[in-house]
Amino acid sequence: MRIVVKVGTSTLTYENGKLNLEIMEKLVRQIANLLNRGEEVVLVTSGAIGAGMGKLNLKEKPKTIPEKQSLAAIGQGLLIEIYEKFFNEYGKITAQVLLTKEDFSDRRRYLNVSYTLSNLLKWGVVPIINENDTVTVDEIKIGDNDTLAALLASLVEADILIILTDIDGLYDKDPRIYKEAKIIEVVEEFSDELFKIAGSAGTKRGTGGMYTKIQAAKICWNSGVKMIIANGKIDNVLNQIANGEKIGTTFLPMKKPISSRKVWIAFNAKVSGRLFIDEGAAKAIIKHGKSLLPSGVVKTEGDYDVGDCVAVVDHQEKEIARGLINYSSEEVEKIKGCKTHEIEKILGYKYYDEVIHRDNLVILERGEKFGS
């Protein structure tokens, strides 16, 4: 079984920002045990900024990007050094992998990351992964390690993603506010209500709250990966989950997941523009799985070229799909609203009948934006 484990800042650190070495040691011991029983494990770890805070004895997380990046530069080396020390005690080898959004949005780099991680796992190495917080800016930032873990789980075709946090799972209400809140044990479908329940609350030391974890679960759901949210401080939590015991909240994957290529289009590819389409075209795409023809395009935004990823927006201005475009933005501007047989007359040539072929088109349920 291939497992991706994500552990958050709130689990790895104390309230004062310093690393909880006891928790880290227990986590490493559990992962080492999983390796001993034949499982493959990728570890996505937060904590670099928290480790930097502890090193400098800072009590509050700075808000400016340069300060956060400086703390990450201090903390990342410390974090990996501690992990390596603990894993060495169990005879396990680790490899540090720092990623940015471009490693996912660029198809060639995306595949290269896949090959690298596959080799590491084949050799029995534990890849320890974090976003490269020291150099990333908003334009190339993934944003949170929940999303990073989900993208990686899809990339390595994991069987399960386990997100360890400081609460026991997804509740029907915020358990920090409502004592009567009940845990949701299993989620099979995604709805607006589920995202409302998740809210947007995080912790002082973490980046994302439950909302980012639901977004991560959505990526896993489409990718055919089971995801579990559990409390990282439960004794032997990873081994209990690997043994099939019910802990936390389990998000079951869709029965017919989309292809790995379409997962890349939906969640990883950089969006270079937007196509606004009419109601008829939206219905044809969503209800009947049709390709997008130029006749259904009302407006185009952005500067994109052939093969770029664009967002498809319906008449209610909701993003309903993403796809790889067959024509440039200049060409689409000329042929929008036209019939297929008119393309050659207008442009002087015709590449395809479709603006986006259905094989390169991914429907986004709930009309929600994923990535950017």
UniProtKB/Swiss-Prot annotation:
Xref: PROSITE patterns: GLUTAMATE_5_KINASE (PS00902), PUA (PS50890)
Residues that coordinate or bind ATP: 6, 165-166, 207-213
EC primary class: transferase
Involved pathway(s): Amino-acid biosynthesis; L-proline biosynthesis; L-glutamate 5-semialdehyde from L-glutamate: step 1/2
UniProt keyword terms in alphabetical order: Amino-acid biosynthesis, ATP-binding, Cytoplasm, Kinase, Nucleotide-binding, Proline biosynthesis, Transferase
Alphabetical list of CDD domains matching this protein: AAK_G5K_ProB, PUA_G5K
Protein's name in the database: Glutamate 5-kinase
Organism whose genome encodes this protein: Thermoanaerobacter pseudethanolicus (strain ATCC 33223 / 39E) (Clostridium thermohydrosulfuricum)
